[in-house]
Structures are given as C-alpha cells and as structure tokens.
Amino acid sequence: AQKQVRSFAEAQLKTLSELEVETHPGVILGHKNIPVQAVGCYVPAGKFPMVASAHMSVVTASVAGVPRIVATTPPFKGKPNPAVVTAMKMGGAHEIYVLGGMQGVGAMAIGTETIKPVDMLVGPGNAFVAEAKRQLYGKVGIDLFAGPTETMVIADETVDGEICATDLLGQAEHGYNSPAVMITNSRKLAEETFKEIDRILEILPTKETASTSWRDYGEIILCDTYEEMLSKANEIASEHVQVMTKKDDWFLENMTSYGALFLGARTNVANGDKVIGTNHTLPTKKAGRYTGGLWVGKFIKTHTYQKIMTDEAATLIGEYGSRLSHLEGFIGCLLYTSDAADDLR
C-alpha cells in the first residue's frame, strides 16, 4: 500500500515545476516550491485502527520533502496499535506519539513541554477532531474540513444490484451518519439494489451502523438521461463517486465536483481508500465544488520572487508604480516609487 501511495505521490510531485521568466527586458519574475517545514499527521484508531490513514498522510508528506513529520494516534484497546505505529515509522514519521482526539491535534498545533508545535495539521478524525482543527485553523494550516464519509454510485443497466448494494453499504458501515447515494437511469437496477441492500444487511457484521446510516442518509435517485445523472452528481458533490456505466470516460470528462472518482466495476471504493495509491483524505459536505483532496501539493508552498536587473527596467517599473499609486491615493507609495525612479535617471 505504501509503495502505491509513494509512487503516485512522486509522480504528482514531478508535475509541480518551479518558474523563472523575464516578463520585460530586465524584469525577472519567478516562483519557488518549498515544503511546509513541520507537519502533524493525525491517524484515528478509536473504533478501528485506521492504518491506511498513516499511509495517506505520512507517506505523502515524506515525498513532499517535509523536514519534520509528527504523527499521533490514540491508544487502541489501551495500548499503541502496533500496525498503526509501524505504518507511521515505515512511512517516514520523525516523531510518533500515542495521543488521541482533540488532545492530539491540539498538542501538535500549540506544542507541549515535549512536543514542538507544527505548521500544518492533516488527517481525518471524529467530530471532536474536526472541530479542533477548525478552531486551530489560522494558527496552523490544515488539509481540509472533513465530515462523515460519503459515497455515491452512478450506475446503469451494465451492472447488477448486488455490486451497487455492496458499494453503498461498504461506506455506510463507517458511521451512523455516512450518506450513501445511488444515481441511475434504470428502474430495474434501482429496485434490484433495494432488495440486495435488505439481503446484505441481514448478514453484515456491521449491520447496526450500516442499517442506521442507510435508513437516515441513504437514497436512490432515478433519472431519465445520462445528462440528468451528471447534473445531479455534480450538485451533490460526494466524497467518493463510483461510476459503473457504459459511459465511464464521459463522466470522467464532465464531472466537475467530487472528492475522487472510481471508474468501472473493478475499481471499488474500498481498495481506492486503502491500497490503490490515490489519497483517501477527501472533501466532504460538497467541498468538492472548490477543493480537491489531500495530495503532495498540499505540503508544498509556492512562493514568488522578483528582481529588476537594469536601471532602465527599474525606471520604467517605477513610473508605472507612481501612476497606480496616484490613482489609488497612496501618497507614501507614490513618493517611494517616484523617488526610486528619479534616483535612476
């Protein structure tokens, strides 16, 4: 799993280029990509030890070149979970603490006698962790405001109800308030999926959680056309979107609001969440309208710089600056830019 996450993050990192360009003779503008200097990675382990979350946060920060990676996780059944701690260490964490909940993220953000504060917090958590990150945002950066996990299945008659039901319940079992939505243009498939959900719930070990979530937050939406399915999917902007149709690539081309797409019946959300290599820290509550999920670029800051190489360029830029300062009414800036230009004449 870590090999897959690392390989994809390394490929993504290669798409982030630094830049230097001469926009006018003697005027050089550029930007540098600098890793965040200290990151705190929170890995949940209260109800279930979320080993995959260590892969997604620690490994990705390591690929980005973060010099100091701090990882915390709550005790699992009274002890540090060995699988989680091992994943943190293998992923590249420099410091590991058994400290859970809002105490964990608070300690990383504010610091303690033994933990130096970090610059950024990443990783999922329960409602208390999410609220702690919200209140700490500003003092530190965060990856995103994550709510309960969400899933959407977009399907047509090319698949059966069993696979749709399995995908829906696979996320519904994560929590009592995890939305699971299906969009289809096949009434037959919709009815078949309802029946399969009832059947699977009877044998599912996590029946209590999954059935409550499906009862309160589950729905199947019947549409007339693929265009209507697309419109509804973009409106809902779900975290996980499983597309199983004869037009998968069309949805890939036209979907604009989502956390991550899982294309085709072979590409199930569970594997995508855990081992396939893309990051599972994704936007929820329609945040996919304006942001993507955690990726190597989240750990990279792009800083601009500028330099003027000739007196002629400095004079020209100074004249432009004087005019704009006068227009805006900033007299101090006007005097500064005017004097700078005059000194070079």
Task: Please describe what each predicted stretch is.
Residues A1-Q37:
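N-terminal Rossmann-like NAD(P)+-binding subdomain of aldehyde/semialdehyde dehydrogenases
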Residues E22-T86:
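Conserved small-residue-rich beta-alpha loop and adjacent elements
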Residues H24-P25, F76-P80, L99-A107, D248:
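Short acidic loop-to-helix transition motifs that present clustered carboxylates
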Residues G92-P179:
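Conserved NAD(P)+-binding/catalytic subdomain of aldehyde/semialdehyde dehydrogenases
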Residues S178-G293:
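NAD(P)-dependent aldehyde/semialdehyde dehydrogenase
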Residues H280-L334:
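Internal helix-turn-beta structural module
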Residues Y336-R345:
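Single conserved hydrophobic/aromatic residue that forms the stacking wall/gate
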